[in-house]
């Protein structure tokens, strides 16, 4: 069993990005600039945004954090999005999700200029991704592809089961795994809460990508010998022994499942760090105008 070390790979990728940024700046080019909008004080969002700002520093990017209280109006938020769309100094920006109930996430996503949508959530980027055109691929699926590549995991002709059908992970992941490219060319099945024979589907899978948000859902009897298991789940489960009061728990019952796998990602330290690195990669592409002029 090989443990897929997302933390180590993410550090490696950040160093590669930093070296490229140093070259750009040495040639008189502009440092990539990532802006982030954070609404309210959601614990998970605070942690993620802090990690993104820190990653920008390591990569040599300029970063800006714009904060609003959770009672900000939808119109005020959309006005800020439009302002960032028109700010030539900002190469890419994100609006950290989830947003308060009174704000339409979809409306916010669609207001972002797709050329600056480094999260890859805008329908234009999602559409381009699904037909294999250059675009900003959403961060978590992109991070998973990077892990498969760096560990040289074979995907062509393999049976891949994606657990979950969210717009952020499940759907794009399924789409990417069936592209005519590496990593891809897999035979993909998407399972979700309404699926029948979900256990049987998993038992036949060479690759399982678990993105349900249900702690310890994937058990030992669901995984065949030699499978590759990618755990996207990060649920905060209360744990009095931890200083934070919670333990980050994946969708896979790691201790039981790991011995059967050829490759597996841990939680934390697997997919999570790669998500942030993918955002950095997209920001670099935006800074270089590599995808959209």
UniProtKB/Swiss-Prot annotation:
Belongs to the tetrahydrofolate dehydrogenase/cyclohydrolase family. One of its GO terms (cellular component) is cytosol. It catalyses: (6R)-5,10-methylene-5,6,7,8-tetrahydrofolate + NADP(+) = (6R)-5,10-methenyltetrahydrofolate + NADPH; (6R)-5,10-methenyltetrahydrofolate + H2O = (6R)-10-formyltetrahydrofolate + H(+). Catalyzes the oxidation of 5,10-methylenetetrahydrofolate to 5,10-methenyltetrahydrofolate and then the hydrolysis of 5,10-methenyltetrahydrofolate to 10-formyltetrahydrofolate. InterPro entries: Aminoacid_DH-like_N_sf, NAD(P)-bd_dom_sf, THF_DH/CycHdrlase, THF_DH/CycHdrlase_cat_dom, THF_DH/CycHdrlase_CS, THF_DH/CycHdrlase_NAD-bd_dom. GO terms for molecular function: methenyltetrahydrofolate cyclohydrolase activity; methylenetetrahydrofolate dehydrogenase (NADP+) activity. Pathway: One-carbon metabolism; tetrahydrofolate interconversion. Homodimer. Its EC number is 1.5.1.5, 3.5.4.9. One of its GO terms (biological process) is tetrahydrofolate interconversion. This is Bifunctional protein FolD. Pfam families: THF_DHG_CYH, THF_DHG_CYH_C. NADP(+) binds at residues 164-166, 193, 234. Keywords: Amino-acid biosynthesis, Histidine biosynthesis, Hydrolase, Methionine biosynthesis, Multifunctional enzyme, NADP, One-carbon metabolism, Oxidoreductase, Purine biosynthesis.
């Amino acid at each position: 069993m090989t443990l897929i070390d997302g933390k180590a790979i993410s550090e490696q990728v950040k160093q590669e990005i930093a070296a490229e940024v140093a070259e750009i700046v040495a040639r008189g080019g502009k440092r990539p600039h990532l802006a982030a909008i954070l609404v309210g004080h959601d614990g998970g969002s605070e942690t993620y945004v802090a990690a993104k700002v820190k990653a920008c520093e390591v990569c040599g990017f300029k970063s800006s954090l714009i904060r609003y209280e959770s009672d900000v109006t939808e119109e005020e938020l959309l006005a800020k999005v439009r302002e960032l769309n028109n700010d030539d100094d900002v190469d890419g920006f994100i609006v950290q999700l989830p947003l308060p109930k009174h704000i339409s996430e979809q409306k916010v996503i669609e207001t972002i200029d797709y050329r600056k949508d480094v999260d890859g959530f805008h329908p234009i980027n999602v559409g381009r991704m699904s037909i294999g055109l250059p675009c900003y691929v959403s961060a978590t699926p992109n991070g998973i592809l990077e892990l498969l590549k760096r560990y040289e995991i074979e995907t062509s002709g393999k049976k891949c089961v994606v657990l979950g059908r969210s717009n952020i992970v499940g759907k794009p992941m399924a789409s990417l795994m069936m592209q005519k490219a590496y990593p891809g060319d897999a035979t993909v099945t998407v399972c979700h809460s309404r699926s029948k024979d979900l256990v049987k589907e998993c038992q036949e899978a060479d690759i399982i990508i678990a993105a349900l948000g249900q702690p310890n859902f994937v058990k030992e009897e669901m995984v065949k010998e030699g499978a590759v298991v990618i755990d996207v789940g990060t649920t905060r489960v209360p744990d009095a022994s931890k200083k934070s009061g919670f333990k980050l728990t994946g969708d896979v019952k790691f201790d039981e499942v790991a011995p059967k796998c050829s490759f597996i990602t841990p939680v934390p330290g697997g997919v999570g760090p790669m998500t942030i690195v993918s955002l950095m990669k997209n920001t670099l592409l935006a800074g270089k105008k590599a995808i959209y002029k």
